[in-house]
Amino acid sequence: MIRVAINGYGRIGRSILRALYESGKRQQIQIVAINELAKPEAIVHLTQYDTTHGRFQPRVKLVDDQMLIGDDVIKILHEPDPAKLPWHEMDIDIVYEATGAILDRNSCEAHIHAGAKQVLISHPSSADVDGTIVYGVNQDLLRAEHTVVSNASCTTNCIVPVIDVLDKHFGVKSGAITTIHSAMNDQQVIDAYHDDLRRTRAAGQSIIPVDTKLARGIERILPHMKDKFEAISVRVPTINVTAIDLSVTLDKTVDIATVNQVLELAANGRFNGILGYTDEPLVSCDFNHDPRSSIVDGTQTRVSAGQLVKLLLWCDNEWGFANRMLDTSLAMIAAKQS
């Protein structure tokens, strides 16, 4: 049994816990502790009730400083300094670092010094970590000696499997990406101050351009794609699910049917459970709570002049990513034991 702790119990931290119980991986992974500065009553309440993902079915209650989920006992901690966390005493194998604030190797090593054996960051990280993993594409790079690993971003997990398939079958010359991302909690409900002037504006009233490093994230997973992609991102007034508009120029001449067939075969084969394919007339809310990293919308595939291909990809930017956190952590343990 893998003993894990969650540091930071926000949108991703809570999704990881819920996904663990819904995915069937609870027999492999046990959440021993949650470190979160919020009040225990709020931690338990937001575990039970979620506007986006609905009510959590297992019985949850608070007893002293512990959250009980059925027969499982999870210690609630409120320690702002990761170096002071009791990971050694708790025999923690992996910390899911989900604060969004601890992103480099030096900061994550506070967990290691506190006694955790490994750290998995739920965010793109600095280049000094042992590896950045998009599960389904490059988890084979994990090694026993790796202690600090990044799970990349939700959008990197969404787009990289598709680029990988296209490149292996047709060759990718270059690409341009627009991420159409649901609002996030670094935005304002009503106009308020923020260092990013666009993010001073009410999230529910505008389509808001934001910076993105998605193109650089692709390069980290697929180094041969260096300087081939650029990306922009906009936030839109929905609370979950993201769409990606991907345009790529291919080496080979293709048509819509060929592109869709290759992607559908990949979704049913090598990337089963990671990549999806649909030709139904769906909208964003239909992909809420979808555990896959990416779903290709075959109805929106377009080809211009035989080599310029436009695709529409969907992902649940919370739930899909949380499920990949579980998968990557299991792969880390498998590599450590090999």
Curated annotation (Swiss-Prot):
SUPFAM superfamilies cross-referenced by the UniProt entry: Glyceraldehyde-3-phosphate dehydrogenase-like, C-terminal domain, NAD(P)-binding Rossmann-fold domains
MF annotations from Gene Ontology: erythrose-4-phosphate dehydrogenase activity; NAD binding
Name recorded for this polypeptide: D-erythrose-4-phosphate dehydrogenase
The organism's place on the tree of life at top rank: Bacteria
Family: Belongs to the glyceraldehyde-3-phosphate dehydrogenase family. Epd subfamily.
Organism from which the protein derives: Shewanella sp. (strain MR-4)
Oxidoreductase keyword on record: yes
SMART domains: Gp_dh_N
EC assignment: 1.2.1.72
Pathway recorded for this protein: Cofactor biosynthesis; pyridoxine 5'-phosphate biosynthesis; pyridoxine 5'-phosphate from D-erythrose 4-phosphate: step 1/5
Catalytic activity: D-erythrose 4-phosphate + NAD(+) + H2O = 4-phospho-D-erythronate + NADH + 2 H(+)
Active-site residues, Swiss-Prot/TrEMBL: C154
Record's subcellular location: Cytoplasm
Residues noted as binding NAD(+) in the record, renumbered to the chain: R11, I12, N317
Binding-site list for substrate: S153, C154, T155, R199, T212, K213, R235
Record-linked NCBIfam families: E4PD_g-proteo, PRK13535.1
A Pfam family reported for this protein in Swiss-Prot or TrEMBL: Gp_dh_C
